[in-house]
Regions:
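Peripheral, non-AAA+ core regions of ATP-driven protein-machinery
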Residues: 370, 376-379, 385-398, 402-404, ...
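Conserved ASCE/P-loop NTPase catalytic core
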Residues: 2-195, 199-454, 459, 465-477, ...
Length: 849
């Protein structure tokens, strides 16, 4: 019985308390907040190196579970690095006067993009005023009138020359609505006589010789018809000659008219240039030197000159709706020169949020867009700086991962319609000029996603060459405990919460060890710690306290468990009602309490399971009933095979192992996996073979190897606390407890209720290293060891097992002999021939088997 006492663990070894004196404060008030990241030296070095390398592909993938401070740390480090970097250039989109569907991208020094856009807007208004003044003054009108007068004089001279030449040919040129008409002239009496003067005779005027007066007039049709054919032909030829001459003169007039328009246009251009020169010169000088902008301003100048009348119309007609948008500037990406490089955290990385888009406006059912409606994406805004993304969110979005890789590989970003990426019929739209991209991308993700991308995406390693892995725990030292205290202090200041007492901080530190189930480590899942701080503060405020005490932290932890353990309570209720059959008192042969852990989404709990074993004569070996019905996994099956190996090593050195055994996990209706109950099954099997009862108040966990050494398991705290609740439900006897592997001592961070029960000797924890130690605790009988002859003491557990196995083997031989005698009596066997008959030989072979 000495092992029962010797292997008990005292209460102070069941939970590692925080060293409150070493923390050196009474409350977190005035305590320095945590600077940097706690317990992540590997990740810190990796991130620092990744940020220092500016080569292509050296982007960073921060690997770690959620809640370990990845995103917060990334933002802090990126902002720190960005502050020491120069602000990148601004980018603007402007109208392409050569091809409006291809807007031009122009880079400007940081802060100049919006300035240029504002200057362009102001310049448009200034140009309207300047052009209005230039073209409304007398000088322009006088110069224009002079040009028109010169043209008109020249036209008159040309027409006069043509008229005189035609008259010399006895023809007149007459303008009609249909054009010019050539009419022959003749000397003939007037077609109508004017009114007679007083004293004029009826015969008409006569000259001095008494002849009638003749005048030169146009020939009438009837007069032309009276001419001979020869005369008519002559007139036709002359008329044709005059028509040709007229056409020549008209062509000359048109040339002069064209020259007039060109002169007027040149005059207008000259005046326009003079008017706009100061405005554009100022704009150009303000944003120089920039070759691309200079070329665009040249194109803008020419377009202004060509369309100056549009400005005049807008000025002279207030109601006129004139579109001046093509002279505007789209301040696409703007950076503050005092802010350093940009740091962009895109929480919704859908395709258009990353690459930007072209917005459309609905105008009476028609979609309209222009370069002003080009909007930037996260990669545009992060250009020259850093882009932070969440891997899970990124991979959920269609095409986002592909476009990110493409930009990182080619360092250029084009704004494209997603439909075109899918190969749909392209829609007529803008195709903004691509912008060169130079940014460092930092992605935070889980280990699962990191390895998934490594396996299935061959391009992943080319664009994310730096892995920064975050650990979920850190060594528990005085320094790390103090860092947790600093985290609490920083949380109080940042969130405006109540300060914590040193005891409350100590409870938080201890819970951080429980999170990782290791008394020598602390969890780095700061978000879970922050949740406890928030909830503890809420309970303290509800009580009207000014400080958060240890009771508030304990209540917060208890309530957190209560909110999630409904299923655990229901299982315990079934045990109280006797539906789940678990014995926690007395001793039973071939029955033992194993321990399992049920893992829910947000809660895990331990509970006992009744394991039974039956043994009988035979040579089938150990058979697990759950395995036979395929309810067990490969690891559990491996543990079962180790049991057979152990039995053979311990008891079958001098004779064959002849036993049939059946082991079952009673009242289990789901799958069973893991080898943490292999030692428990072995105890149960030994009990059944040796017919030694096992203490039902002691539950067991731990795996075993072929040599009989106990191996560590997981979930030790949940298992102990789970069995404690079952024992407490029916009343603690002071003899109950749990046997655990010695290696699991370092993982013990039991709750205060269990540690108090152990302190009062109402519950016990035994720590063992071998099967022999465990069997002595369970039976109260020495396990036994082989003497110099290789035999066990008959009163020991191993001796009883060996005796039982030898007895079964002997009975088996007697049984076989008896069966052989029944088939072939001894007298008959003596008269047999030397060569047995075929049937008899088969019987002997079967019996031997």
């Amino acid at each position: 019985m000495s092992l029962i006492k010797d292997k008990r663990l005292p209460a102070d070894r069941l939970r590692r308390a925080a060293d409150l004196e070493a923390l050196g404060f009474k409350t977190t008030k005035g305590l320095d907040k945590l600077a940097g990241l706690v317990g992540q030296d590997r990740a810190v070095r990796s991130v620092g190196f990744g940020l220092s390398v500016q080569s292509k592909g050296y982007n960073i993938f921060m690997v770690g579970e959620r809640g370990c401070g990845r995103t917060t740390y990334a933002m802090e480090e990126l902002r720190r690095a960005a502050a020491d970097m120069p602000a990148p250039d601004d980018w603007v989109y402007v109208y392409n006067f050569d091809d409006p569907s291809l807007p031009l991208a122009i880079s400007l020094p940081a802060g100049k993009g919006r300035e240029l856009a504002k200057d362009a807007e102001d310049a448009i208004e200034d140009l309207k005023t300047a052009l209005s003044k230039a073209f409304d003054n007398n000088e322009f009108e006088d110069n224009k009138a002079q040009l028109v007068k010169s043209f008109q004089d020249e036209v008159n001279a040309i027409m006069e020359e043509l008229r005189k030449w035609a008259e010399s040919k006895d023809f007149a040129i007459k303008r009609t609505p249909q054009g010019f008409v050539n009419l022959p002239l003749i000397m003939a009496p007037p077609l109508s006589q004017p009114p007679r003067d007083e004293g004029q005779n009826e015969a008409g005027d006569k000259d001095e010789e008494g002849e009638k007066q003749l005048v030169r007039r146009e020939m009438q049709q009837e007069e032309f018809e009276k001419l001979s054919e020869e005369q008519q032909e002559t007139l036709h030829k002359v008329s044709e000659e005059i028509s040709q001459k007229t056409l020549e003169k008209l062509r000359l007039i048109r040339e002069r008219e064209k020259e007039l328009k060109e002169k007027i246009k040149e005059l207008e251009s000259q005046i326009c240039r003079v008017a706009i020169a100061p405005i554009l010169t100022e704009l150009r000088a303000k944003h120089m030197p920039n070759e691309k902008l200079s070329r665009w301003l040249d194109d803008l100048t020419e377009d202004l000159i060509a369309n100056f009348n549009v400005f005049l119309a807008a000025v002279r007609d207030d109601a006129a709706e004139i579109d001046f948008s093509r002279y505007e500037v789209n301040a696409f990406v703007s950076n503050n020169p005092r802010d350093g490089a940009p740091v962009v955290c895109e929480t919704n990385p859908i395709y258009y949020n990353l690459v930007g888009k072209v917005d459309y406006e609905n105008r009476q059912g028609n979609l309209y867009t222009d370069f002003r409606r080009i909007t930037p994406g996260a990669m545009h805004r992060a250009n020259g700086g850093f882009l932070l993304l969440d891997a899970d969110e990124l991979l959920r979005q269609f095409m986002s991962w592909d476009v990110l890789k493409r930009v990182l590989r080619y360092r250029e970003l084009s704004i494209e319609n997603l439909g075109e990426q899918l190969g749909y019929i392209p829609v007529s739209s803008l195709r903004p000029e691509p912008i060169p991209i130079d940014m460092k991308v930092v992605i935070v993700g889980t280990p699962y996603l990191y390895y998934l991308l490594n396996i299935y995406d061959p391009e992943f390693q080319k664009v994310f060459k730096i892995k920064a892995e975050f650990d979920s725990d850190m060594p528990r030292t005085a320094e790390s405990e103090y860092q947790i205290a600093q985290f609490v202090a920083g949380f109080v200041v940042r969130e405006g919460r109540l300060n914590f007492t040193v005891a409350a901080v100590g409870e938080v530190i201890e819970w951080a060890s429980r999170l990782v189930e290791d008394r020598n480590k602390l969890s780095t899942q700061l978000n879970k710690i922050a949740e406890v701080l928030v909830e503890s503060t809420a309970y303290a405020k509800a009580e009207g306290k000014k400080l958060v005490g240890v009771d508030h932290v304990r209540r917060a932890l208890a309530e957190k468990i209560y909110r999630a353990d409904m299923w655990e309570d229901k299982v315990l209720e079934e045990y109280r009602k006797g539906v789940i059959c678990i014995d926690t008192e007395g001793s039973v042969v071939g029955q033992i309490n194993g321990l399992t852990v049920s893992q829910l989404i947000d809660h895990s709990f331990g509970s006992p399971v009744r394991i039974t074993a039956n043994v009988f004569m035979g040579a089938e070996g150990v058979v697990n009933i759950e395995r036979e019905v395929r309810m067990t996994g490969p690891i559990h099956n491996k543990g079962l095979m180790i049991l057979t190996s152990y039995l053979g090593r311990m008891y079958a050195r001098d004779f064959p192992l002849s036993v049939s055994a059946r082991i079952a996990f009673e009242q289990t209706y789901g799958g069973i996996e893991g080898d943490s109950a292999s030692s428990t099954e072995l105890y149960c099997l030994i009990s059944a073979i040796a017919d030694i009862p096992l203490n039902q108040g002691i539950a067991v966990t731990g795996s075993v190897d072929q040599m009989g050494f106990i191996q560590p398991i997981g979930g030790v705290n949940e298992k102990i606390e789970g069995f404690f609740r079952y024992c407490k439900a029916r009343g603690l006897t002071g003899e109950q407890g749990v046997i655990i592997p010695v290696q699991n001592e370092q993982h013990l961070m039991l709750n205060h209720e269990v540690t108090e029960a152990v302190k009062k000797n109402k519950f016990h924890i035994w720590s063992i290293a071998t099967i022999d130690e465990g069997i002595e605790i369970l039976t109260g009988i020495p396990a036994g060891a082989r003497d110099e002859n290789g035999n066990y003491s008959k009163e020991s557990v191993h001796g009883r097992v060996q005796s039982a196995l030898e007895g079964w083997l002997e009975r088996s031989f007697r049984y076989k002999k008896l069966m052989a005698d029944r088939v072939d009596p001894p007298k008959k066997r003596g008269k047999k021939k030397a060569a047995p008959e075929k049937g008899e030989e088969g019987l002997e072979t079967k019996e031997a088997e």
